[in-house]
Amino acid sequence: MGSSKLLSLALLLVLLTHANSASETSFNFTSFDTNKLILQGDASVSSKGQLLLTKVRGNGDPTVDSMGRAFYYAPIQIRDSTTGKLASFDTNFTFSIRPYSNNENSAFGLAFALVPVDSEPKRKDYFLGLFNKPDDPEAHIVAVVFDTSSNQIEIDMNSISPVARESCHFHKYNGEKVEVRITYDSSKKNLRASLVYLREQSATSSTSSVHMEKVLNDWVSVGFSATSGLYDPTSETHDVLSWSFSSKFSQHTTSERSNFLLNMFL
């Protein structure tokens, strides 16, 4: 076999290996590491390894008009441009939101979001650092919002007007640990978010049909964004305590990509 064919074969093997490894991404934070995160705005990691999305005072109380975002340091592929197929994903995290003096009128909440790579923070308040205007077709964002102003779980797509919502009385459980699971089934285009307050096992869920390919770029950043109220009685903390994430293209999609690469060299 000639040297050029050997080189081509070696390149093909590298590409096939990369194609298969790129089909799946997973990580797990039981304690957060700043080296594995992109921190924006007021977001920080505490000495205990907790992700603090908004600023807190020395005594742990929230500060007003604070906004922070935190994303996994590496981009995640959500769509394969070769096959047009989408990845499914599953993410689990725990968080707590504690209002100032246990006030029941705190704002504005926290969101799990898929945003464009290299995205910068946007407006505060109920925009949650994700949007600059109420409706923005060019935002390329899908978010699951835990809206403490309206006491509901929302699914947002390029807009602060939700495509799905479900009531959730956040202020009934001030400061308690919340466990969240969000799944996306790419074959059914189904996005589901479920929330459980661990102490009372009180559960809420919201589901919507989401065509990710119509909203998101092929590669995204995944993570969190939060904003706090404009004065003390409406301020609140937004702490993420743990986070795991996994995404995967179907085996059929991986095979299609491998066949495409093979055909390039035949």
From Swiss-Prot:
Quote the function comment for this protein.
Answer: Seed storage. This carbohydrate-binding lectin has toxic effects on the important bean bruchid pests, Z.subfasciatus and A.obtectus.
Signal peptide as annotated in the record: 1-21
The Gene Ontology terms for molecular function here are: carbohydrate binding; nutrient reservoir activity; toxin activity
Protein name (database record): Arcelin-4
- Which Pfam families does the UniProt entry name for this protein? Lectin_legB
Q: Write out the entry's keywords from A to Z.
A: Glycoprotein, Lectin, Plant defense, Seed storage protein, Signal, Storage protein, Toxin
Q: Which InterPro entries match?
A: ConA-like_dom_sf, L-lectin, Lectin_LegA_CS, Lectin_legB_Mn/Ca_BS, Legume_lectin_dom, Leguminous_Lectin
Q: Does the keyword Transcription regulation apply?
A: no
> Could you tell me the Gene Ontology terms of the biological process aspect for this record?
defense response
Glycosylation sites noted in the Swiss-Prot or TrEMBL record: 28, 92
Disulfide bonds, which pairs? Answer: none
UniProt source species = Phaseolus vulgaris
The root-end lineage is: Eukaryota, Viridiplantae, Streptophyta, Embryophyta, Tracheophyta
Q: Which family does it belong to?
A: Belongs to the leguminous lectin family.
